Amino acid sequence: IREAQQAVDTWIKTYGVRYFSELTNMACLTEEVGELARIMARRYGDQSFKDGENQDPSEEMADILWVLMALANQTGVDLTEALQKSIEKKTKRDATRHKNNPKLTADKKEKDL
């Protein structure tokens, strides 16, 4: 992740002139998440795609990562370190939580039958 953050930083400074403001990038991130949500709703929900509409979630996921990395760079967040801390936090907090959740284990039991 750290290398990708550096690549985003280099691209912005080389081709983008400078970073957009944090608020603008936050709005851009929200927009990209909305675009992914539209694809997911059409693919897995009840709506169908319109003619010519983007159906590729990977493109939108990559756009989300791009803007998230730009925001991280602007705010001094090392996403490699932050993700590791998040994994550790979730592991400590949820070590048995999901294994003991009947809502999750019921499906597994039904599939095993």
Where do the protein language model's features map onto the residues?
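Flexible "arm" and connector segments at domain edges
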Residues: I1-M61, L65-L113
